[in-house]
Amino acid sequence: MSLSEFSLSGKKALVIGARRNMGKGFALGLAEAGADVAVTDINIESGQLQAVSEQIEAMGRKSIFLKTDISSQKDVKKMVDKVMLEFGGID
C-alpha cells in the first residue's frame, strides 16, 4: 500500500518529541496522510517545534505545538487537556 492509498482524513494525532528526527517524521507523515496533528517537545525555544507545526498547517491540516515535559504528570495532564480542547479528541 502506498501512502496515497492510506488516509487518516478527519483523524487527530498527538506526537511527543516532534521537534526533530523520528518524531518530526512521524508528525509530518501523519499530516501528509490527512490527520490534524498536535506536536509536543520539552524544548520549544529553538523554534524547531513551531516550524514543524507550521509545515503541518501548510499541508492544510490543523496543528498546535506545546512545550511538555512528559516526566511531569502536571505537564502531561495540561497537554492532554489542551489537545482535547483544541481538537475535540485524540485518535
Predicted segments, located by residue:
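Rossmann-fold scaffold of SDR-type NAD(P)-dependent oxidoreductases
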Residues: 16, 67-68, 90-91
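Amphipathic, non-transmembrane alpha-helical secondary structure
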Residues: 24, 28, 32, 50, ...
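Canonical Rossmann dinucleotide-binding motif of NAD(H)/NADP(H)-dependent dehydrogenases/reductases
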Residues: 5-38
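Conserved glycine-rich Rossmann-like NAD(P)H-binding loop of the short-chain dehydrogenase/reductase
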Residues: 35-51
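A glycine-rich helix->loop->beta "capping" turn
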Residues: 59-62, 82-91
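The beta1-alpha1 cofactor-binding region of Rossmann-like NAD(H)/NADP(H)-dependent oxidoreductases
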Residues: 46, 66-81
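A short helix-to-beta-strand connector/capping loop
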Residues: 56-64, 74
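Generic hydrophobic, amphipathic alpha-helix propensity
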Residues: 8, 22, 49-52, 56
